[in-house]
Amino acid sequence: SLGLPGDLQKRNAAVAEAALQWMRSSHAVISDQAIRQGFASAHWPGRLQWMRWRGQRLRVDGAHNPPAAIELARERLSWPSAETRQIWILAIQAQKQAPEMLQQLLRAQDVAWIVPVPGHRSWNVEQLRQALPLQAQQLKSADTTGTALDQLLAQGWPEAAPVVAGSLYLIGHLLENGTLEAE
């Protein structure tokens, strides 16, 4: 059993297990029980993590580059709400490949709230609308993650839990200041 959610983590664990088996063949003393315990207790805050904001359920993921966005989009396929409109709250640093990330994440019915990464230069909604004219109508802007969440709550919390992603700094900030609570 693996303590980390998601197919990518299962693939990573398989690679780690193969490396551990190879190490054991070189006379390293690593028991099967130690390997099982290590995998079961693995925990990565901010990676496909269920959280709560004012009692409302949401998911956070630190996906901050195109390969991570591809994996997050792939992971979405296994969610019960996979075919439902997804609300994204995305904060992406200015030096990152935000248009490529949004092309991976957004489906036609989705909406993305673009928020700044606290304390960092970030992509804004106007830049992304220029870079992605076909998705421009799907992009909204908020000053903070909290403001975007307030808007969602005022409109009626979405059926599919919103996903906060795009920056490990944002996730760290939200966890550190207590905006989000772990489930």
Across the structure, where does each feature detected by a protein language model lie?
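Active-site-proximal loop/hinge segments that shape catalytic or ion-binding/gating pockets
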Residues: 167
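Nucleotide phosphate-binding/pyrophosphate-handling subdomain across enzymes
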Residues: 1-111
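Active-site catalytic pocket residues across diverse enzymes, especially alpha/beta-hydrolases
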Residues: 23-24, 76, 80, 132, ...
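C-terminal helical cap/extension that packs against the catalytic core
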Residues: 57-60, 99-161
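Residue-identity detector for threonine
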Residues: 84, 144-147, 179
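Short, active-site-adjacent cap segments at secondary-structure transitions
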Residues: 170-172
